[in-house]
A protein has these predicted regions:
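Walker A (P-loop) ATP-phosphate-binding motif of ABC ATPase nucleotide-binding domains
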Residues: 2
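Flexible, charged surface loops at secondary-structure boundaries
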Residues: 44-50, 81-84, 132
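Phosphate-binding beta-loop-alpha motif at adenosine-nucleotide cofactor sites
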Residues: 91-93, 108-112, 130-149
Length: 154
């Protein structure tokens, strides 16, 4: 099973990834968007066994829905297949944009874009839950305990 960590910049994905690694979970690097065949790379990760992944093909779908650029090379059919072997944790805080700015990150340039990304995540993950039966857990590290994440994974 792959555990996909998703969420806007500043939402706590990388911190959660580090905590899960310290807890003993296998953490794998995400598949590069520059890969010519991302689907094959995801299949290799699934075949490798349980792992935590910081961002996934869902990230590409969300960000492309906001900036109107072409999405990656994974088809909807392939995505539905991959999701059978994944659980998704959406890291979500009300202050993600501000937290990102405090750290000096500049991937998201304004609050309006950050809000669009947050809304796109919620919409896309709701649709994936409904139509593919994907398991999604929303985690706000400022309000919830780490053990809630562990319970979802296990």
């Amino acid at each position: 099973m792959l555990i996909l960590l998703e969420g806007a910049d500043g939402s706590g994905k990388t911190t959660l990834c580090k905590q899960l690694k310290e807890f003993g979970f296998n953490v794998e690097p995400t598949v590069s968007r520059s890969e010519t065949n991302q689907y094959e790379q995801w299949i290799k990760l699934i075949n490798k066994g349980d792992a935590i992944i910081d961002r996934s093909f869902i990230t590409d779908l969300v960000y492309r829905s906001v900036d109107d650029k072409k999405a990656g090379n994974i088809t909807l059919e392939q995505m539905c297949y991959l999701l059978k072997y994944c659980k998704i944790i959406l890291c979500d805080t009300d202050s993600a944009f501000e937290d990102s700015m405090k750290r000096g990150e500049n991937n998201i340039v304004d609050k309006e874009t950050a809000t669009k990304i947050k809304d796109a995540y919620k919409l896309i993950l709701t649709m994936l839950e409904k139509f593919t039966k994907a398991e999604v857990f929303t985690y706000n590290w400022k309000k919830q305990k780490f053990n809630e994440v562990i319970k979802f994974i296990i």
